[in-house]
């Protein structure tokens, strides 16, 4: 049995190793939750044996050593971290400790903020001008990242307004919105560059580039949450008041900052943010709760590495470790072969996860994944769980290589990978049962033809019994034939037939989307429908004509053109129309005749809207004569930026395109 000294030594060594990977190499090997668990275990042991605490223990300092490649900046006021709580009971205990330490039963109000998952930085302004910026580093000394911070558009190089202090050091978080993260990885996969495991790593890697020109290309953003140095000026005597003052001077502050009057209100804030988390557009891992009164903060003071007046209330972990038991290969509706990791089941963010996507062969190679490996699994919002990285330091001896198939696992046809594409595909087409099933599931889905009651299991049976080969065959089904399916009684069968009849009345855009043309999503389908107006005109369009549609480039235009050039596809469309599928005749909108500020303009929506859904906003803009595109280009006239707008906003600013916020959009819609 290990001695207490040995346990402490091993824990400290392990934590230092992972701190180095996290803070210095930007390549964490374990999830935050596992790091937190190890730190809690070390603290508990040191609490029981205080005589064994050493000055260099991870519990006695804030972060990790700065990278030698950067010059260093010593923080005039140490950048401390926060203590964590993980459940309501622990938060209420923290609340009680605060109340007990204050004199005369003073009322406490709480300033609650989002706990952003990025990189903590300090930014020093002298007479309102940005002069330096540094990472947290080890809490006393950080890396000089001034040149890189100056490239972040959200951070003002000069403050504006009145009564700006002679020296003001603001502290906050640099982070990368989800859209920007996806764009960076998409570009990296295309060019063979480094693919980041998560937005936090991407933000850290972007901010700590030795070449600021690379940082400038990354759509980083920033929210401030506190102050370090303050000289030659005054600030309000509440935390919220200070944040509002920062905002007046041009510093970005999250609009989710909330003042809570009681512990009950804090818990309500926590649960509301947890509910909204999937729609924020950027990663958070909890909320930060601070005593609002600066006077009370001073009374409460600090412990060795954290303030007594603040705490981070963390959400259930979105990353966990488990083992890969096998890798299987699924076939999608376009023939794409997707490797899927079969996992030892593990709870991630409150959901039991037993499968995770591996995307493609390149991703398996990048991860260095073998069957039997210990891996980190991430699940964020509604995103399909994915393997973040392999824990190489704990690789078992009996792992096996993952072998990508050369023949389709469903129909046996050759698997082909076109040069320049990451995805390998089955060449079997509609003779492949998997492709047929997935194509039909897409066709009847809610955003396509919206056939109520026709779920995946029904489609599986219809294909396996060879009742259905093409989408047109669905509309030939009878209640009698459906009754022969498993768990399908006469009433349910008739309901499906009725739903199919109802689905015949659709829109041109939905119909195009339902056909499952490669690279044609909802937005592109809507653009094609609006531009060409009728199926006959679209079918006859050349590749050059197709590229005139907003958001349609050479690749999409080629896929659309080739789809309609294929005789079997035209035959299926003819059958669908013969079965009664129809949509209203197009309403020709002449932008010149519409009195609207959006008429004739190509508009792009980015970020999340709070007052209406994206679909409703798109529909209203089209009614007013706009063309709504899915990406920003030189053809774009206007960008509407909601909360957490990412790479599209950055590109619009780079191209000098007009940008308005949701409030201005609503005002113009109303006018």
Curated annotation (Swiss-Prot):
Write the Enzyme Commission number(s) for this entry: 6.5.1.2
Which Pfam families does this chain map to? BRCT (PF00533), DNA_ligase_aden (PF01653), DNA_ligase_OB (PF03120), DNA_ligase_ZBD (PF03119), HHH_2 (PF12826), HHH_5 (PF14520), Nlig-Ia (PF22745)
Q: Name one GO cellular component term.
A: cytosol
Q: Would the keyword Heme turn up in this protein's UniProt record?
A: no
Active site located where? 115 (n6-amp-lysine intermediate)
Which reaction(s) are listed as its catalytic activity?
A: NAD(+) + (deoxyribonucleotide)n-3'-hydroxyl + 5'-phospho-(deoxyribonucleotide)m = (deoxyribonucleotide)n+m + AMP + beta-nicotinamide D-nucleotide
BRCT domain ranges (all copies): 593-671
For whether the record's keyword set contains Endoplasmic reticulum, the answer is: no
Q: What class of enzyme is it?
A: ligase
Keywords per UniProt = DNA damage, DNA repair, DNA replication, Ligase, Magnesium, Manganese, Metal-binding, NAD, Zinc
Q: Where does Zn(2+) bind?
A: 408, 411, 426, 432
PROSITE patterns named in the record: BRCT, DNA_LIGASE_N1, DNA_LIGASE_N2
Record GO terms (molecular function):
DNA binding; DNA ligase (NAD+) activity; metal ion binding
Essential cofactor(s): Mg(2+); Mn(2+)
**Per the similarity annotation, which family is this?**
Belongs to the NAD-dependent DNA ligase family. LigA subfamily.
Q: What does this protein do?
A: DNA ligase that catalyzes the formation of phosphodiester linkages between 5'-phosphoryl and 3'-hydroxyl groups in double-stranded DNA using NAD as a coenzyme and as the energy source for the reaction. It is essential for DNA replication and repair of damaged DNA.
User: What is the name of this protein?
Assistant: DNA ligase
Q: Which organism is it from?
A: Shigella sonnei (strain Ss046)
User: From which lineage does this chain's organism come?
Assistant: Bacteria, Pseudomonadati, Pseudomonadota, Gammaproteobacteria, Enterobacterales
